[in-house]
Swiss-Prot record:
PANTHER family: PHENYLALANINE--TRNA LIGASE, MITOCHONDRIAL, PHENYLALANYL-TRNA SYNTHETASE. GO terms for molecular function: ATP binding; magnesium ion binding; phenylalanine-tRNA ligase activity; tRNA binding. It catalyses: tRNA(Phe) + L-phenylalanine + ATP = L-phenylalanyl-tRNA(Phe) + AMP + diphosphate + H(+). Coiled coil: none annotated. It is found in: Cytoplasm. It comes from Ralstonia nicotianae (strain ATCC BAA-1114 / GMI1000) (Ralstonia solanacearum). Binds 2 magnesium ions per tetramer. NCBIfam families: pheS. GO terms for biological process: phenylalanyl-tRNA aminoacylation. Tetramer of two alpha and two beta subunits. Its EC number is 6.1.1.20. This is Phenylalanine--tRNA ligase alpha subunit.
Length: 344
């Protein structure tokens, strides 16, 4: 045990520093730290020493071993850095070369319709509002004058969610975007409640909606746009004028025929289905509409004796299908690039 451990460490450091590749470094490692290496042999010989000497010599040898391992790791890192620098130098990028053009994508046809509808109504002063897709039963149905026994509230038509909100109200996936009209109107009323007269409420609410339905013309998830205009002097004539003008702009034609067919919706009174003529005497439903029911106006925080207005709701997929002559709603959700490229 008279071996100079400082000299062993110095020899190892010199040996490691002299190698130029990992294979040579592993050979030098074996000479000092391998099964028959210098330091390994010294550790094996500790068993021949008396306990007191074994303890002190073991500490010295382990310290030397730690220093050798540190030198080994330093050299490994240096070789790795040198290899990386060599690769970077060999693969240097000429930053003066022109870059690759970013491939242009395109909007989905339904999103094109979404933006087109928002632009058309925005041009005549309508705000665009967005709201939660998980709604309360009260906001989705009760606030809109849907009675408790209305079939739309059944689990056969509506996706209900386990749990309740902080006010212990049932939660569901909204079946239309009309709840956002109520939310927007209530915020509008709160904002201007200090005034004697609430400014007109003009808003559309496009978004995803959900119903338990799936076939060639229905999907469990679909897009709707709901519109609302409430003031103190809005009539059914305003509804006819606004929506007919929208259809002319959307279909880019002044030569369109529109009819308002009496119907029933719990949230409007009177109510009407809006149909549009599409050749050969065919009339196709475009939208539901009507004068906002007094109960709904009241739930918006307004006095129905002072304020009146109209509302409408249109399916964005349906508008898209009619504009482009698409017969199967499911094509929008299959992700077939051959289909989608036609609208790029």
């Amino acid at each position: 045990m008279s071996l100079d451990l400082d000299q062993v460490v110095a020899d190892a450091q010199t040996a490691f520093a002299s190698v130029e590749d990992n294979a040579s470094l592993e050979n030098e490692k074996a000479r000092f730290l391998g099964k028959s290496g210098v330091l390994t042999d010294l550790l094996k010989g500790l068993g021949k020493l008396d306990p007191q000497t074994r303890k002190s010599e073991g500490a010295r040898i382990n310290l030397a071993k730690s220093r050798v391992e540190a030198a080994l790791n330093d050299r490994r890192q240096a070789l790795a850095d040198a290899l990386m620098n060599a690769r970077l130098a060999a693969e240097a990028i000429d930053v003066t070369l022109p870059g690759r053009d970013v491939a242009e994508g395109s909007l989905h046809p339904v999103m094109n319709t979404w933006e087109r509808v928002a632009q058309i109504f925005g041009s005549i002063g309508f705000d665009v509002a967005d709201g939660p897709e998980i709604e309360t039963d009260w906001m989705n149905f009760t606030a809109l004058n849907n009675p408790d026994n209305h079939p739309a509230r059944s689990m056969q038509d509506t996706f209900y969610i386990d749990g309740r909100d902080s006010d212990d109200k049932l939660l569901l996936l909204r079946t239309h975007t009309s709840p956002m009209q109520v939310r927007y109107a209530r915020m509008h009323v709160e904002k201007y409640k200090h005034l004697d007269r609430i400014p007109p409420i003009k808003v559309i609410a496009p978004g995803r909606t959900y119903r338990v339905d799936s076939d060639a013309t229905h999907s469990p998830m679909f897009h709707q746009v709901e519109g609302l205009w409430i003031a103190d002097n809005i009539s059914f004539a305003d509804l006819k004028g606004v929506y007919t003008d929208f259809l002319r702009k959307f279909f880019e034609s002044d030569d369109i025929q529109v009819r308002f067919r009496p119907s029933y919706f719990p949230f409007t009174e009177p109510s009407a289905e809006i149909d549009m003529a599409f050749g050969n005497g065919r009339w196709l439903e475009i939208s539901g509409s009507g004068q906002v029911h007094p109960t709904v106006v009241r739930n918006m925080g307004l006095d129905p004796e002072r304020y009146i207005g109209f509302a409408f709701g249109s399916g964005l997929e349906r508008l898209t299908m009619l504009r482009y002559g698409i017969n199967d709603l499911r094509l929008f959700f299959e992700g077939d690039v051959r289909f989608l490229r036609q609208f790029a």
